[in-house]
Structures are given as C-alpha cells and as structure tokens.
A protein has these predicted regions:
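Chalcogenol-based redox active-site neighborhoods
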Residues: 1-176, 183, 190-196
Length: 196
C-alpha cells in the first residue's frame, strides 16, 4: 500500500469552487456547490474514496466527525476523485452504498473530471481541508496519528482541534502534519504537475 502525503496547500487560500453531483442519497441534494456546502462557521472538504485502506481505517470516525462538525456550524462534504475505470469499487453506485453503510450525514460528491481535486491540490485519500467562515484555508493536514497497522487510537484529535479553533474564531496555527494515504487514482495522462 503506497503512502502519499498531502501537498499542504497554502494557508489562507480561498476555497476553490465546485459544483458536483452528490451520491449520498440520504442527504437529499442532487448537486452541491461550495456555497451550498459551507456552514455559518466554515467548511470541511474531505477527499476520500471507498477502497483505500487508509480511508476504511478511519471511516467510522469520519462519520462521527462529520456529524459533530455540522452541529457546530461547519459544513462538511466528501469528494471522491478517483478514476473509476481502473478502480470500479469507487464508482458512484458504490459511493451511495458506502455512505449508507457508514452513516455519512454529509454529501458524498463525485469529481469525475478530477478538476476539483487539482484545484485543491489534493494528493491522497484521506486529504482534509478546513476553511473558516470567510472560506479561507485554516487547516490542511492529518485526522490524527492513526494509520492502518498502527496501534494509535482513532480519535480525529488533530482535525477536531482545528475545528474547535475555527468554531471559536481562533487561529489554528501553522504546526500541521500532512495527511497520509493512498494517492488519488488519476486518469492516464491527467496526472497533475504536483503528483509523483
């Protein structure tokens, strides 16, 4: 299992726009944009997928964290940008199944063109981007220290600490560890400059 780190997009970056189809039928929206997704206190964008062991390892915590963040005024979306021709387990029909199985209460969007992932400079699954109420990037980094095969408990402590700071209107700080996971599965010939 290859380990790919986050690119660590520059803090303060404005949330890149998106308007993508939603495959979590439990949330009701057919399409979701940045404006739709943002809460009064901010927005959490998570690049995930169905098959990556790094995502599977923390999926239950993602469900809990998504619920908790929304309760504190942070909008939450997950985006799958993987090439589904090479990785059919990540196809939209399976996204719907995964969202229901995990109890995701947030939209699960499909970035078929992979342009949104490139705009965020997303590199791995999971990859997290937390924006403040002005939709400026406050945190990009890991959920916590847990990894498949490690004994670290899955607590979401790093991302939860950042969410608490954003909700309180406080600075998150710049000491942020990159997320780590499977690389996004780019379509052949579509790999971004920052990949590899």
């Amino acid at each position: 299992m290859a380990r790919t780190p986050s690119t660590m997009l520059e803090l303060g970056t404005k949330a890149p726009a998106f308007d993508l189809p939603n495959y979590n039928t439990g949330t009701g929206e057919e399409r979701v944009s940045v404006q739709d997704a943002a809460g009064p206190r901010g927005l959490l964008v998570m690049f995930i997928c169905n098959h990556c062991p790094f995502v599977i390892h923390v999926a239950d915590e993602l469900a809990r964290l998504g619920h908790d963040a929304k309760a504190h005024g942070i909008g939450v979306v997950a985006i799958n940008a993987n090439d589904t021709h090479k990785h059919p387990a990540d196809a939209p029909v399976h996204m719907t199944e995964e969202a229901a199985k995990r109890g995701y209460t947030f939209p699960y969007l499909f970035d078929e063109t992979q342009e949104v992932a490139k705009a965020y400079k997303a590199a791995c699954t999971p990859d997290f981007y937390l924006f403040d109420a002005d939709l400026k990037l406050a945190y990009r980094g890991q959920l916590d220290d847990a990894r498949p095969g490690s004994d670290e408990p899955i607590t979401g402590k790093d991302l939860r600490r950042a969410i608490n700071a954003v909700v309180a209107g406080e600075d998150v700080g710049t000491d942020q560890k990159p997320s780590m996971g499977c690389n996004i599965k780019w379509k052949p010939g579509s790999e971004p400059d920052y990949f590899g």
